[in-house]
């Protein structure tokens, strides 16, 4: 593993069928630029069995030593109840083992980051079954997401027809990595 002293933040999101991972090393006082590595794979029901192997391979592929991790951010939903629990349990286990803090990040916001262009306003949604979605309205500004309408479970018909809609893609785990650095609270949003 690398001897690079740069701090790294790990983000992961498992609230959808996708396993989304990110490693982020923010720009330092030395003028270095941010480094972000992303990986997403649709694991569906294989998430629990594949998570740790995928995570280990991802971190090794980018040559980041475990001791370089400063904090871990995890997607807290809304979304799959089981997926959220798997992600939070993995993050807490890693955090405890590495002696680092674990923070929470909204999955709808991570979807907005993945699917909206800079300055764009739109809805992000996750299927909640029975004609409902977990959905919220957001604006992307650079790597930040402004919440315009809080995410919640609602009938799909409440999402305006023709509105910009982000769904069915992997959330951007960079959102969780940034939440790790900010020390966001770890509060699950099961829906």
Regions inferred by a protein language model and the residue ranges of each:
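A short glycine/serine-rich beta->alpha loop
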Residues: 38-43, 76-80
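Residue-level signal for alpha-helix termini/capping positions
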Residues: 60-63, 96, 116-117, 182
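Phosphate/pyrophosphate-binding loops at sites that engage ATP/ADP/AMP, CoA/4′-phosphopantetheine
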Residues: 55-71, 140
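DPxDG-like acidic metal-binding loop motif
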Residues: 70-104
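Generic beta-strand hydrophobic packing signal
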Residues: 39, 69-72, 189
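Oxyanion-binding and handling regions
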Residues: 1-35, 42-50, 103-191
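Short amphipathic alpha-helical face segments that pack within enzyme cores
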Residues: 50-53, 89, 93, 110
